[in-house]
Amino acid sequence: MRQIFQNNYSALGNVTFRRRALERAKEYSSDTPRIKSGTADSISSPKSENYEQFKKANLPSKRQKEKSPLERGFRGVFYMLIILLLSSTLNAQSLQSYQQEAAQNNPELKASFNRYLSELESRPQVGSLPDPEVAFAYFISPIETRVGPQRARISVTQMFPWFGSLSEKRSVSEANAKAQFEQFQEQRNRIFYQMEMIWSDLFEVEQQIRIAEENLRIINTLLEVSLSRYENGLTSQVDVLRAQIEQEDLKTQIELLKDNRRLLKERFNEFRNVDESSEVIIPDNLSASMALKNKDELKSTIIQQNPNLNKLRYREEASKEMVSLADREGKPSFGIGFDYIATGERTDVTNLSDNGRDAFVARASFKIPLFRNKYNAKVQQAELNLNSVQQDIITLENKLETDLYTALRDRSDAQRRFNLYDTKQIQRVEQAINIMMESYSSDVSDFEEILRLQRKLLEYQLKRIQAKADLYMANSYINYLSGVNNITENELNY
C-alpha cells in the first residue's frame, strides 16, 4: 500500500486498470471464494428471509413476548431519529472535504507550491538592467594640467543589453513559472486521484465485511439446523463439519478485511497529513460523478486541460523565447558613463582663468561579440531544446489518447459485468438456494450442494462489488486525465 505512485500516466494505468484486470483474471484458489479489497457502490444485501423461515421450520421456536402497538410505535420513532442523526453525521465529511484538507496540509503539495512561488521571484531578477558601476581613482602623483593638478576621479557606468533582450528574459521566466504551476496542479490532481482510489477501497472493504458477516450469519443458521438434524438422527455429522469449516473460513476472512480497512485508513490519513489514527468516515455509497461525453469530446477536453500537457506547452513557449534570446545575446551591448575629475588650483600662476576647474567627461562604450562560436552554439542548443519539447508534446498526446481509450474500454467492461451479476447471476443463485433449502427441509436436497451454492452467491456478490469498483475507478481516472480538479492562480488558498 505504500508503493510510490510514479508520476506518469503509464504508471497510473498500471496501478488502476492493470491491477484490476489482474485481480479479475485470478480465480479463487479454493471452493471458498477469497474476499478481495477494492471499491464498490451501494450493493444490496443478500436476501435472508428464506433462511429465517428455514430456521424456524427446523428449530424449536422460542416464545416471545408480544409488544403492544403503542410500544412498537415509540420504538419505531426512536429508531428513525437515530438513523437520521447517524446519517447527518456520516455525511458531514465527504470525499471533497477530505481532498480540500489534503490540499491545505499535504507537505508534498506545499513543497510544490513553494517551488512555484520561487519561480515567480525569478522574473524581477532576469528582467532588470545590470547594476551600474561606480569607480573611484586617486592620483598618487597628480597629473599636472593647464588649470591645475588632477587629484581624483569618480566614474559611473551603466550597460544596456541589445534591444528586447530584457523583455525576452521576462517572457522566459513567466513561461517557466506557468509551467511550474501546472506541475503543482498535476501533483494536486494526482493526490486527489490517489485519495479517490483509497476512498473506493475503503468503501469496498466495508461492503465486503458486511456481505461476509451476513453470509456468516447464514452459515451459523445452517450450522444450527444441521446440528438439530444430526441430534435427531436426520443427517450425518459430515453436514455439521462442513458448516463449521465454512464458518471458520469466513471468520478468518473477516478479520483480514478489518486489518485491510485499518491500513487503508492510515494511508488515507497520510495524504491529509493528520495522525494515522484519525477517524475516516467511510461513505455509505459511491457516485462516479462524470459528465457524459463521447470519446471525441473527452479527447478534446484532455488535450486542452491536462496539466502535464499544459506544462509542456509552457516549456515550448519558454524554449521559443530562449531561441530568440540566444540570438539577441549575440548582438552588441552598449553603455554610457560619466566621469568627474577633481582638479586643484595652480599656485605658481596668478590671474589664470579657469584655475582649478574640475573636469566632466561623458563616455559611450560598446561590447562587440566577435567570437561567434559561443553564441552560435547557444542558438543551436535552444533550437534543439525546442525540438525536444515539441516531440515530448506529441508523445504525451499519443499516450493520453491511448490511456483514454483504455479507460473507456474498462468502463464499458465494468458496466457489462455489473449488469450481469446484478440483474442475472445473483438472482438465479438465490432462487436455486431457496429451492434447495425447501428440499433440504424435506430431507431430499444435498447439504453440500447448499453450501456450494452459498459460496457461489458470495463469489457473485464480491464480483458485483469489484465490477462497480472498476466502473468508479475508470471514471475517476478519466476525470484525472481531463483535469476536472484544475484551479487557477486566483483560487489558491495558501
What feature does the model see in each segment?
Residues 135-171, 282-292, 324, 337-374, ...:
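Small/polar, glycine/serine/threonine/aspartate-rich low-complexity segments that form flexible
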